[in-house]
């Protein structure tokens, strides 16, 4: 008998999905999930297949297949895109790959749910393609400073009405493809500087994201990585 005091027992971080799990097939994932269950894990980060959420959301907004694929970073870099550090780096070129990842991601979440786990899903911090004005005119978007020498990324102003529109579109597409399981991870300006200085801007970001989550899911819990916490965002 294994007794674990902690109620919430999370497993894996974003980097793991590139450092270790990038090329895992279903057989390897099933073995990992069974191992999680045996060790008492009940809240695994579950982002496999998020390529499909990005792709089909952008398609719904009016992007072409190539335009949507271009925003999605390649296999080795996608987790850093989901942390907001980069985008469009060694971009995808094949929609069939997106659909293959979608199928694998569904199997993973189904198995986690079957074993009584609660998947932590991807949230939204307002990161958008640099071409967002083509489909959402008059959107107020900023350049976010370069992270580790990668090209700059783009962030919708949290006070802009399209901040919630874009974020809700992503969350709804994720629900359609994978279900909604109440825990949503995102780390605004992870290991980077915000585009605007001052606590007020960070408070606006935190408030906008929190209100978006609860509007989408009344049971929503925002999950963040501890080492990049910003107090004004957390307390907003």
Outline where the language-model segments fall.
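Aromatic-lined carbohydrate-binding surfaces of glycoside hydrolases
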Residues: 3-236
């Amino acid at each position: 008998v294994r007794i674990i005091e902690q109620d919430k027992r999370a497993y894996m971080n974003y980097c793991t999905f590139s450092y270790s799990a990038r090329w895992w097939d279903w057989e390897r994932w099933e073995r990992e999930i069974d191992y999680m269950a045996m060790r008492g894990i009940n809240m695994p980060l579950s982002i496999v297949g998020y390529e499909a959420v990005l792709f089909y959301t952008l398609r719904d907004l009016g992007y072409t297949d190539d335009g949507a694929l271009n925003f999605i970073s390649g296999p080795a870099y996608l987790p850093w895109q989901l942390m907001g550090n980069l985008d469009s780096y060694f971009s995808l070129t094949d929609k069939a790959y997106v659909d293959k990842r979608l199928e694998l991601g569904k199997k993973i979440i189904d198995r986690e749910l079957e074993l009584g786990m609660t998947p932590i899903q991807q949230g939204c911090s307002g990161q958008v393609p640099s071409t967002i004005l083509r489909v959402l005119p008059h959107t107020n978007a900023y350049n976010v400073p370069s992270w580790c020498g990668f090209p700059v990324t783009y962030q919708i102003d949290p006070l802009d009405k399209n901040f919630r529109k874009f974020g809700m579109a992503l969350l709804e597409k994720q629900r359609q493809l994978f279900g909604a399981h109440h825990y949503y991870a995102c780390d605004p300006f992870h290991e980077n500087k915000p585009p605007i200085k001052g606590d007020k801007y960070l408070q606006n970001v935190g408030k906008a994201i929190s209100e978006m989550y609860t509007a989408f899911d009344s049971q929503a819990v925002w999950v963040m990585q501890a080492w990049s916490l910003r107090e004004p965002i957390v307390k907003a």
